[in-house]
Amino acid sequence: MQTSSFISSSMPLSITNRSGSLNEMEFVNLFTQKPKYDCLLFDLDDTLYPLSSGLAEACRQNFKDYMEEMLCIDPRKSDNLCTLLYKNYGTTLAGLKAIGYDFDYDELHSFVHGRLPYVNLKPDPVLRKMLMSLPYRKLIFTNADKVHALKTLNILGLEDCFEGIICFETLNPIHRSSVSVDEDDIEFLGLTRTTKPTSSNSASSSQIFDIIDHLAQTNPSGILPKSPIVCKPSENAIQLALKIANLDPHRTLFFEDSVRNIQAGKRVGLDTVLIGTSQKVQGADYALESIHNLPEAIPDLWEADLKSEVVYTGKLAVETTVTA
């Protein structure tokens, strides 16, 4: 006689979920199917807090002030120039570098963000609870600098809701020999100063590309100068962020308030959520008035957490000793 052990499947087995009992096939699928997403990638400004806070408007004004006070740009041109640079380069900072201005990045960020009305932001416990309940990797992806990102998240009470922050310094690691893809190093790569201070932040007029005059022509000839800055909505910036964080674009959900950033994300394979309007646009898989509408708009995001809520009822399969 020889004895052996095996797991018997002849005993009755049933489990229940939120909606009731699951049959055997549903039980198998429940434990074998992967969630649709591995990671939720969030923009910061005007996405995790509303546009009505006034920070975006203040940021634009601060950029104009910096251009006039520190770069000696004619106040009569600063407003138009700010608009054209943002439209054509993704950020005003990237545009200023493209057309020939030299300045210290840390100084500009400190000037522009240091004067923002952070007092308009308040802790958001509702958003915090929602984010903490989502069973995925969660990352911030912003064009802003690390100081602003940290301060904003801290005020909102969300500083520990995210695994890491991909920011200006992450995407523009000047003076680094390589970009780390270590997940533990996602937060704030490339913290070294990205340009050396110059004796003057202004530049001679002969060195500056006149983008206003160029675009005012009926048929502008040539192409605009390229910027050394990597930022959204560049597809290269999004692909770099995905590489740094080791993300599969087809298993990542991207949250943004910018239509052009949403469309760029869609082009690289991301599923996308436009925040700030309920009107869907080309490139947006979902459109929400507020990030707070997420549970109602995409309830499936919480289904990935179903396994932790499974309740077993009845008799389970048990190890049985048999004689053969």
What is the meaning of each model-derived region?
Residues 47, 142, 257:
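Conserved G/P- and acidic residue-centered "switch" motifs that form tight phosphate/ATP-binding loops
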Residues 54, 118-122, 140, 225-233:
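Short, surface-exposed alpha-helical recognition segments that flank or form part
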Residues 2-3, 7-42, 47-125, 136, ...:
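N-terminal helical cap/lid subdomain that shapes the substrate entry/recognition surface
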Residues 1-37, 132, 146, 150-324:
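Asp-based, Mg2+/Mn2+-dependent phosphohydrolase catalytic module
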Residues 68, 98, 117, 139, ...:
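Short, flexible active-site loop motifs that bind/organize anionic cofactors or intermediates
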